[in-house]
């Protein structure tokens, strides 16, 4: 059990990542949060900015009512701003925004306007600072993620296989690829911490095959390791069958059906983790209140498969699964980059 107490080491960890974002003495910085945000991280962010001589100010919005039929977790599509133009304007005027909303701004509807206005956004995931401290980014991680993103942008086909029966193909031409290493200093861009992964959003009709979730894989929407096999059949991006007899399959079937939205069954993104500091067992070490599961997304060599929104394929939905799949082999145009769950030294 961790205590929500400010620690000097966490101020320093936050300051190091913020410094990497190009924040200098006297720079304004907007701290965007909502009433249900993790207050320890809000306080650490303010103290870290002051430690760097920046001039922080707070934008705090009420956490909105959940308009959906089920709890929403790990979507990356915060609804906290709610279209409030003054909040968007303040973010643009600040030039640098630290996002501490529960779900994050990555896919929020207001984010394009903030980025188009020239602001840069550091989204700090809703993790306990103990995890954030362990997952501090570094230059080597950034270099490898950049290299992997360039490789994926030039890839025509990703194929993923496993001994459990996974055989999935994603046609990558026209996909939008994002490399996330944990900070951004470039205006008009967004990064999130923890980082250490690369993901691609394929264009419509690009993903087909079978994905088998085996015991030990993870479902981060439910913050649990998979205990019994789940077999997903995917045709032209959509999950057309979800087979399995255990609680994992039932949870997934019920959650997807609750949305009443076909796009909740569609592929959001595909990619893989690259962070050697991210630990597979971490999900078992924290209570659900203290983790958002971001660490497992970044575990080196995991195949990160997600369902739900893909704006690059014209699909918008709040239903979302992030599924780190362990032990797969990932090939890009026939070149293996992950073998049996181990990231190869090719980036």
Explain the meaning of each model-derived region:
Residues 106, 176, 238, 276, ...:
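Short loop/turn segments at secondary-structure transitions that flank enzyme active sites
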